[in-house]
Amino acid sequence: MDYLKAINDKFITFEKLILTLCTIMLVLAIFIQVICRYILMISTPWAEELARYLFVWMSYLGGGYALHSGGQIEIDIAPTIINYLKISDDSKRRIILTLKTIGLAITVIFILCFCYVFSNYIMFIYRGVQTSQTMGIPMWIVYFPVLIGSLITVWHGIYRILLNIKMGKGDN
């Protein structure tokens, strides 16, 4: 399990670096857009397009980090109900852990299906000649970080499933 933790730590470092760079670029693009529009009175449509793409990239690349840190949206009605049951605390913990593991497995399966469909879409776009309107970037490059972020989310989901299984066996 230690080698998986090392791989996961590398992914986290990579994600933090990419998200930090995207945030800096996003702030700079918006800053340039505001300065050019309101002070220099010139239009910079590329800055708006870049900011839009960076925001989408950050959303998908940040999804894996959110899953890793437990920051994703989840419905916790089942754990709340289970905590009111008159069973031992260990049984409650195991049931809640099992439900969370099942939820993670469903999430991973859904994202894998999304990755399959989206990779076919990217290949379709790659064969075409579509480019972004203002910057002229090939659209497959624009969409590619969505696939990468989804695959990283799958990795974090599988890693958390393995951690839950390890915790369920009592190997803390």
Model-predicted segments: where are they?
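Alpha-helical transmembrane segments and membrane-interface helix-loop junctions
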Residues: M1-N172
